[in-house]
Amino acid sequence: MNNHQAPETETLAETDNFMAWRANEPDGETTYYLQLGRATINFFMEEWDELLASIAELKQAKANEEGMFAVSFDNVDVWMDNEDWAEFLQLLRDLEK
């Protein structure tokens, strides 16, 4: 008999290529996920709160000399071109609502 319970999930924001969602795990913990294209980054609640607190700063980011934007999550750096960055910012704006 399989007693495995699937987490309850809720989409928090979504664009054409990016998505943010929350999972309420069977053990009572809440985790958050940020899917950026093919990459999915998971966050514990405290880390998610840090991301939300940094939205204003992320909106002010400038591209480097190659026209690329970078965002760092714990041990992961994600580089985006102008089009992807604009979509990422839209996702962040939707999360602020």
Q: Over which residues does each language-model region extend?
A:
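Positively charged, low-complexity terminal tracts
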Residues: M1-K97
